[in-house]
Amino acid sequence: IGSNSTKNRIIDGLQKVKLDKFFKPEQVYSFDLVKNPKPYPDIYLKVVKENNLNKDETIIIEDSVIGIKAAVNAGIKVIGFTAGGHWHENRDEKELLEAGAIFVTNDYNKIDKIIEQY
């Protein structure tokens, strides 16, 4: 996880939605670990480097325009997710596509199928 939030807030959020069992604390990257926050690519480049990931084989799931821009700036494919906590009804999916998302969905169940296509 790469976020512009604090590590404690990220972990609290994961616990609230019962996703904390999927992420170890060392897999949570907060803005204070990098020089520049999103939309700069720093956080995603750090995640890729520290986890020995190949950018071409990595897909980021983002719920904000600024996060999508960070992924694009890092050279990593990104899926826009509109059911996230930052999603507001007045925001158009078009914004996420224009920011560089390869696909936009509001359905958790579609993410696996989208990833398989890329």
Q: Where are these predicted regions, by residue range?
A:
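Asp-based, Mg2+/Mn2+-dependent phosphohydrolase catalytic module
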Residues: 6-118
